């Protein structure tokens, strides 16, 4: 009985269903959670590392310029030079030729009838841009005519190059590649020209970065692109906001001068500290360098390999940060798997999608909604636990302890305990996951996973002492009052471990009277929990400031049907004769419906007074112990 009483059996049900409901709400916001635990972890992210291409940018690369011999031109003007067969035209034609034949992308033949800008291309985004430029300048089929592709070394993020062996001669004259001459092929190359490619940032990214930083999380860029390119995009996206940008050479000089970054401190008035590092810098970094890096506010990691992205994640995790990592490529998979929350975007590679914990179905803009839901679900779960404990644990446990220490009859049946926890409280608690934020959650700091717990001392004090004890006293008073009115005085139960005179001489009458008293206890707990449900919705605000009905931005209309369903279940269990015999329940008088309502009004009024003191006197004792 003690185990049944102390453990709120509805808690696992309520928590699991709450997380499931929140995950479905996130799905409606185009955010797909692959595990329920991810919903809660999202709210505690302190460092978010974002890939550039496809995440911060549109991944819609367009070649906007071609440069040869120091002469810069647009692809359209370069085409005119080719048509006029000028010396510059010959140079531009070489660029066009290399772009067409040394390319891993290919056009979809089914879209050949469409305008060039609408034709579908298979391949890497960079290859697509160059192939489209080559088609615009002279035509890809003309460039490929007469050439055979004998050997290809595909591009990978570690080598950062791709090789193609082309020839018009007999295949018999071609010698195979080995490790030694592969190295030779990467040296003494001839620069044919430069192609400028533009991949515009997504319009929503600057505001998203600002909101995530406003929520107390640091936002970094981790990309395989060149440092200057990454820095330029970072400035456009608002990732770097200061003019002074440190580099690897500055880390030694800054050793010991930078204060440790405290996520939960007031950093608003501190000057921003920016840093740009390349993959080659990361290879040379010591633990002291990593310690210095962890203290910067704005960081761009450029030209990184998969191993280096993984090192970045581990660096911040080892310093008690909760790391979120976004990525869409195969090379991002190790870092996505290692991060506390791996985030990918719809359209990413299969490997990235498989490795991620969270998939953004409509671009990176929905990341703000994901973080908001992560914080909201934690807050609502705390409310759920605070709601479940008074009736589902405190009052039931006191009934068992009273029977053990004071010889009283167990005034609530074991089956009724389980029904209260698994049905009544579970049904009503599910409405708490529908609650809207009490304040602006994305303007507060992320929770500290090492200090902030779902059920801390303040919450337990509120649930067991401030709410649980008054509820228990009311339930006991009502139940034993009914028993005494039916002819069994309290003195005949007090310290009568084996039953008093009536229990001995009239056992059937005594058992029936106790069963009716248990039903009174049962209904009193259920009805008073309604008022606990209305009160537990807020921690600081009054019920009039956040009404459950009448105001769209604060309403929770599911509460009242849940209360009604809870009462219907109790009536069904207690008033249907066949069910009465199974659960040992009995019908109760009308007065036992209305008196708990009066007690509940007193209880919610007391909590309103407590909240008023907490709001008005934030340094008071009540404010310090408020959950």
Which functions belong to the PLM regions below?
Residues 474-527, 538-541:
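Membrane-interfacial loop- and helix-cap regions that link adjacent transmembrane helices
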Residues 466-470, 474:
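A long, glycine-enriched binding/interface module in the latter
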Residues 459-464:
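Alpha-helical transmembrane segments and their helix-start/interface "positive-inside/aromatic belt" motifs
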Residues 1-457, 469, 522, 539-627:
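Conserved cytosolic headpiece of P-type ATPases
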């Amino acid at each position: 009985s003690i185990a049944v009483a102390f453990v709120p059996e509805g808690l696992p049900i309520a928590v699991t269903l709450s997380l499931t409901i929140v995950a479905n709400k996130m799905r409606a916001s185009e955010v797909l959670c692959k595990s329920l635990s991810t919903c809660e972890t999202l709210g505690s992210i302190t460092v978010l590392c974002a890939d550039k291409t496809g995440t911060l940018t549109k991944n819609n690369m367009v070649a906007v310029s071609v440069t040869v011999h120091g002469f810069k031109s647009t692809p359209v003007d370069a085409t005119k030079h080719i048509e006029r067969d000028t010396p510059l035209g010959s140079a531009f034609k070489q660029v066009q030729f290399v772009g067409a034949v040394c390319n891993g992308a290919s056009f979809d033949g089914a879209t050949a009838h469409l305008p060039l800008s609408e034709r579908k291309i298979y391949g890497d985004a960079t290859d697509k841009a160059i192939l489209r430029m080559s088609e615009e300048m002279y035509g890809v089929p003309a460039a490929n005519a007469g050439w055979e592709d004998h050997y290809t070394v595909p591009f990978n993020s570690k080598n950062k190059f791709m090789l193609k062996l082309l020839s018009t001669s007999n295949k018999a004259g071609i010698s195979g590649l080995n490790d030694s001459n592969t190295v030779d092929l990467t040296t003494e190359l001839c620069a044919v020209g430069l192609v400028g490619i533009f991949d515009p940032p997504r319009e929503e990214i600057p505001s998203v970065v600002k909101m995530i930083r406003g929520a107390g999380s640091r936002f970094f860029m981790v990309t395989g692109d060149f440092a200057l390119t990454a820095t330029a995009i970072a400035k456009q996206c608002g990732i770097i906001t200061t003019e002074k940008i440190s580099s690897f050479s500055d880390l030694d000089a800054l050793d010991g001068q930078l204060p440790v970054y405290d996520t939960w401190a007031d950093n608003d008035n501190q000057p921003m500290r920016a840093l740009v590092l390349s993959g080659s810098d990361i290879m040379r970094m010591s633990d002291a360098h990593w310690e210095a890096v962890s203290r910067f506010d704005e960081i761009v990691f450029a030209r990184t390999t998969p191993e280096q992205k993984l090192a970045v994640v581990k660096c911040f995790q080892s310093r008690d940060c909760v790391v979120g990592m976004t990525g869409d490529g195969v090379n991002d998979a190790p870092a996505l798997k290692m991060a506390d929350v791996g985030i990918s975007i719809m359209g990413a590679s299969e490997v990235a999608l498989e490795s991620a914990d969270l998939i953004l179905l409509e671009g990176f803009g929905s990341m703000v909604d994901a973080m908001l839901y992560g914080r909201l679900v934690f807050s609502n779960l705390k409310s759920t636990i605070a709601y479940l404990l008074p009736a589902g644990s405190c009052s039931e446990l006191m009934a068992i302890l009273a029977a053990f220490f004071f010889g009283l009859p167990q005034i609530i049946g074991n089956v009724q305990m389980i029904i209260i926890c698994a049905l009544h409280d579970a049904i009503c608690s599910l409405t708490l996951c529908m609650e809207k934020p009490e304040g602006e959650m994305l303007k507060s700091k992320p929770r500290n996973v090492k200090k902030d717990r779902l059920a801390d001392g303040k919450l337990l004090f509120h649930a067991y002492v401030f709410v649980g004890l008054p509820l228990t006293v009311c339930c006991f008073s009502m139940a034993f009052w009914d028993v005494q009115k039916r002819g069994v005085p309290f003195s005949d139960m007090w310290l009568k471990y084996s039953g008093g005179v009536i229990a001995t001489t009239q056992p059937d009458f005594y058992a029936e009277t106790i069963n009716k008293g248990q039903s009174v206890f049962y209904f009193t707990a259920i009805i008073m929990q309604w008022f606990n449900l209305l009160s537990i919705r807020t921690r600081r605000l009054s019920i009039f400031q956040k009404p459950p009905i009448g105001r769209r931005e604060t309403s929770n209309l599911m509460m009242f049907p849940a209360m009604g369903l809870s009462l219907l279940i109790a009536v069904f269990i207690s008033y249907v004769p066949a069910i009465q015999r199974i659960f040992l329940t009995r019908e109760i008088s009308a007065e036992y419906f209305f008196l708990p309502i009066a007690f509940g009004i007193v209880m919610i009024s007391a909590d309103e007074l407590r909240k008023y003191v907490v709001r008005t006197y934030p340094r008071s004792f009540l404010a310090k112990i408020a959950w």
